[in-house]
Amino acid sequence: MKVAVITPTIGNPKLVDALASVDRQTYTDLTHYIFIDGKEYVKPVESMLEGASKVKTVVLEENVGKGWYGHRVFAACSFLVNADIICYLDEDNWFEDCHIEKLVKKIQDGYDWAYSLRKIYDKDGNFLCEDNCESLGKWPVYFNNEVHHIDTSSFAVKRDCAVRIGHAWYGQWGADRQFFSNLSKHFPKFDCTNAHTSCYRLDGNPNSVTKEFFDKGNEVMQERYGDNLPWKNPQRLHQIEIGPGIKLVQ
């Protein structure tokens, strides 16, 4: 199955990490489509592409991201690339080497789409922690049992599905949430790789979560599930006591 990795960019210097991580993938039947979001960004982006062996570029004459949102590119890309599976990668994040291989294997098991878990890094690329509290997909976020979330850079979706649901990307902050909501509703056959292979950089922008958010959330989940975190140990059943003699199996 041929994979397309989609990255909209305005030349963030961190793009070099994204490029290198795609080049290092153990799964090799892939193309990294770099959508340069505005002709004014061509030169700074091209200076970072030297040596990137998987790249094809698409130059947009006008900026459509309005600063740093690339969701309009994600919405349109499924109609523009030649691939069986689409992965999305923000320009300031990156993948572990086995990321795409694990996602493809999961889809080959019969799923329409799949997602990974993620690791959290500071703005300089230093590892902080695993995210075991927010981007969990099937399992709710730590602060609200009604809310589920998957980060943009964790998805892998069959292109045929992405074409039918791509419009759900259209939006600004929180578009990954509305995409997940629509994708899981219309294509409920999906699964998690149970591996933290997406690398998420905390960048300190006004909408960015903090290290303290994950510290608190991971602590809450540890108290809730103990050592048997179900997204890391999918074969284990976890029981939560919700009343005298009453246990909820998850």
What are these regions (language model features)?
Residues 30-41, 58-62:
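Short beta-strand/loop segment that forms part of the nucleotide-sugar
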Residues 101-129:
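Conserved donor NDP-sugar-binding/catalytic core segment of glycosyltransferases
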Residues 44-80:
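Active-site-proximal specificity loops/subdomain of glycosyltransferases
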